UniProtKB/Swiss-Prot annotation:
Keywords: Ribonucleoprotein, Ribosomal protein, RNA-binding, rRNA-binding. One of its GO terms (molecular function) is structural constituent of ribosome. PANTHER family: 60S RIBOSOMAL PROTEIN L26 FAMILY MEMBER. One of two assembly initiator proteins, it binds directly to the 5'-end of the 23S rRNA, where it nucleates assembly of the 50S subunit. The keyword RNA-binding applies. It holds the Pfam family KOW. It comes from the Archaea. One of its GO terms (biological process) is translation. InterPro entries: KOW, Rib_uL2_dom2, Ribosomal_uL24_CS, Ribosomal_uL24_euk/arc, Ribosomal_uL24_KOW, Translation_prot_SH3-like_sf. Part of the 50S ribosomal subunit. The gene is rpl24. This is Large ribosomal subunit protein uL24. Belongs to the universal ribosomal protein uL24 family.
Amino acid sequence: MVSKQPRKQRKARFNAPLHMRQRFMHAMLSPELRKEYKKRSAQVKKGDTVKVMRGDNAGVEGEVLSVDLKRCVITVAGVSNFRADGTEVPRPIHPSNVMITKLDLDDDEREKIFSR
Protein backbone atom coordinates (compact mmCIF):
# COMPACT_ATOMS: atom_id res chain seq x y z
CA MET A 1 0.00 0.00 0.00
CA VAL A 2 1.21 3.49 -0.80
CA SER A 3 1.51 5.89 2.10
CA LYS A 4 -0.78 8.90 2.55
CA GLN A 5 1.88 10.86 4.41
CA PRO A 6 2.85 14.02 2.49
CA ARG A 7 6.51 13.64 3.42
CA LYS A 8 6.63 10.16 1.89
CA GLN A 9 4.76 11.37 -1.21
CA ARG A 10 7.33 14.16 -1.66
CA LYS A 11 10.21 11.74 -1.06
CA ALA A 12 8.83 9.31 -3.65
CA ARG A 13 8.65 12.08 -6.28
CA PHE A 14 12.12 13.34 -5.37
CA ASN A 15 13.70 9.87 -5.57
CA ALA A 16 11.71 8.68 -8.61
CA PRO A 17 13.73 7.18 -11.47
CA LEU A 18 13.68 8.95 -14.85
CA HIS A 19 11.25 6.51 -16.48
CA MET A 20 8.74 7.28 -13.70
CA ARG A 21 9.37 11.04 -13.89
CA GLN A 22 7.95 11.04 -17.42
CA ARG A 23 4.52 10.67 -15.84
CA PHE A 24 5.03 13.95 -13.94
CA MET A 25 5.62 15.78 -17.23
CA HIS A 26 1.99 16.02 -18.36
CA ALA A 27 0.20 19.22 -19.31
CA MET A 28 -3.43 19.90 -20.15
CA LEU A 29 -4.56 19.97 -23.75
CA SER A 30 -6.33 22.96 -25.31
CA PRO A 31 -10.14 22.64 -25.67
CA GLU A 32 -9.79 22.01 -29.44
CA LEU A 33 -7.26 19.19 -28.94
CA ARG A 34 -9.35 17.82 -26.09
CA LYS A 35 -12.35 17.42 -28.41
CA GLU A 36 -10.26 16.01 -31.24
CA TYR A 37 -8.34 13.37 -29.25
CA LYS A 38 -10.78 12.82 -26.33
CA LYS A 39 -7.91 13.18 -23.85
CA ARG A 40 -7.56 15.75 -21.10
CA SER A 41 -3.76 15.86 -20.83
CA ALA A 42 -0.64 14.62 -22.58
CA GLN A 43 3.05 14.27 -21.94
CA VAL A 44 4.97 17.37 -23.00
CA LYS A 45 7.52 16.68 -25.73
CA LYS A 46 10.19 18.76 -27.43
CA GLY A 47 8.59 20.33 -30.50
CA ASP A 48 5.10 20.78 -29.03
CA THR A 49 3.61 24.27 -29.05
CA VAL A 50 2.45 25.38 -25.61
CA LYS A 51 0.82 28.43 -24.06
CA VAL A 52 2.00 29.57 -20.62
CA MET A 53 -1.02 29.86 -18.31
CA ARG A 54 0.54 30.94 -15.01
CA GLY A 55 3.27 33.27 -13.80
CA ASP A 56 4.87 36.42 -15.17
CA ASN A 57 4.88 35.04 -18.73
CA ALA A 58 1.21 34.03 -18.80
CA GLY A 59 -0.21 34.23 -22.31
CA VAL A 60 3.09 33.65 -24.11
CA GLU A 61 2.89 30.92 -26.74
CA GLY A 62 5.98 29.14 -28.03
CA GLU A 63 7.63 25.88 -28.97
CA VAL A 64 9.06 23.56 -26.31
CA LEU A 65 12.85 23.77 -26.64
CA SER A 66 13.81 21.17 -24.03
CA VAL A 67 12.34 18.78 -21.47
CA ASP A 68 14.40 18.19 -18.32
CA LEU A 69 13.22 15.05 -16.52
CA LYS A 70 15.81 15.44 -13.77
CA ARG A 71 14.41 18.82 -12.67
CA CYS A 72 10.84 18.23 -13.96
CA VAL A 73 10.84 21.44 -15.99
CA ILE A 74 10.52 22.50 -19.64
CA THR A 75 11.89 25.50 -21.52
CA VAL A 76 9.74 27.41 -24.00
CA ALA A 77 10.82 29.68 -26.86
CA GLY A 78 10.07 33.29 -25.98
CA VAL A 79 10.21 32.74 -22.21
CA SER A 80 13.58 33.83 -20.85
CA ASN A 81 15.43 35.80 -18.19
CA PHE A 82 18.38 38.13 -18.57
CA ARG A 83 21.56 37.78 -16.56
CA ALA A 84 23.35 40.75 -15.05
CA ASP A 85 25.76 40.82 -18.00
CA GLY A 86 22.83 40.98 -20.44
CA THR A 87 22.91 37.43 -21.78
CA GLU A 88 19.56 35.76 -22.31
CA VAL A 89 18.89 32.42 -20.58
CA PRO A 90 15.80 30.22 -21.00
CA ARG A 91 13.47 30.28 -18.00
CA PRO A 92 12.41 26.84 -16.72
CA ILE A 93 8.66 26.26 -16.36
CA HIS A 94 6.80 23.41 -14.68
CA PRO A 95 4.59 21.53 -17.19
CA SER A 96 1.50 21.96 -14.98
CA ASN A 97 1.64 25.70 -15.75
CA VAL A 98 1.29 25.32 -19.52
CA MET A 99 -1.40 24.22 -21.98
CA ILE A 100 -0.52 22.26 -25.12
CA THR A 101 -1.97 24.02 -28.17
CA LYS A 102 -0.30 21.98 -30.95
CA LEU A 103 1.09 18.46 -30.74
CA ASP A 104 4.24 17.25 -32.48
CA LEU A 105 3.08 13.94 -34.00
CA ASP A 106 6.25 13.10 -35.97
CA ASP A 107 6.82 10.11 -33.68
CA ASP A 108 4.83 7.05 -34.82
CA GLU A 109 4.48 5.72 -31.26
CA ARG A 110 3.05 9.02 -30.05
CA GLU A 111 0.64 9.15 -32.98
CA LYS A 112 -0.56 5.65 -32.03
CA ILE A 113 -1.28 6.86 -28.48
CA PHE A 114 -3.54 9.63 -29.77
CA SER A 115 -5.27 7.50 -32.40
CA ARG A 116 -6.57 4.96 -29.85
